[in-house]
Amino acid sequence: MIKNKTPSVMIATPCYGGQLSEGYLHGVMSVTQSAAKNNYRVHLNTMGNESLITRARNTLVSQFLDADDANPDLFTHLMFIDSDIGFNGDAVSRMVLSGYDVACGVYPRKSIDWERLPELIKKSDKHLEQRALGYNLNFSNPDNIEVENGFTEVMDAATGFMCIKKEVFRKMIEAYSNLKYTSDQIINGKKYGSNNCYAFFDCIIDEKSNRYLSEDYAFCRLWQKIGGKIHVDLRSPLTHYGTYPFAGNVWTKFKIDDEVKVENKNGNDLQQSKD
């Protein structure tokens, strides 16, 4: 738990095109209530119209660090919450008050495991929706998963719901001064002149596995290389919003439906559904 200082969180949200999901909006409204209840402060910072997600994240970090340079007592945590994540404010409180350097939520992938559906339906239709979803989880010790208050250590975690202590960035600046860069961004019509631009969130090829790592997994590796740990909250429910295409062909439906047969004028049998 955090002691001797009231936590203060900058919620950082990349929102390309200025778009936010309904669940995100409800979550932001909810977190103000949860923060007041749990005695910490929140400030919302968004970045629209930056198509490069890596640069958006690094810029939001630089703004967090700029604010800290101006007033070291202003923020204790930066929390990335992506605009397509639906959440409850208490999930944010669990991250902030956990005491972990990096604490993350786990949300479903934007996919449905269609191949498993027949098997799942045969077993039981209870919780079918949840069983058909997939999650990106890479436990640090899969043979002995230790859970404390719903949190466990992992190798990788997504940035879409990630709470990071300020001290993490200060340690990384000291360890990775070579990652500092000069920004060429134009923000609000002006050249962005922050002195705190570091490529902490950038895609890499992992040295050991040769895997291509996204910017969130790459950040995890940088932090782990200097002795840091990543924890995830297994208890807090999250929603991952996406655009699902309901693609259909009514002719195909007739052909595969076994309920009622009809004959078309060309002589081919069709199947007609009763509903």
How would you label these PLM feature ranges?
Residues N88-C203:
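Conserved catalytic core of nucleotide-sugar-dependent glycosyltransferases
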Residues A36, V96, W223-Q224:
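Anion (oxyanion) recognition and catalysis
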Residues H77, D101-V102, I230:
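Short, Asp-centered acidic motifs that coordinate Mg2+ and/or phosphate
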Residues N4-P7, E174-D275:
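C-terminal catalytic/acceptor-binding lobe
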Residues I53-N71, R221:
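Short, conserved alpha-helix that lines the donor NDP-sugar binding/gating region
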Residues A70-G86:
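Short beta-strand-to-loop acidic/aromatic patch adjacent to the donor-nucleotide binding site
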Residues T32-N39, L65-L74, Y176-L179:
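Alpha-helix termini
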Residues M1-R55, D269-D275:
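N-proximal low-complexity "stem/linker" segments adjacent to membrane-targeting elements
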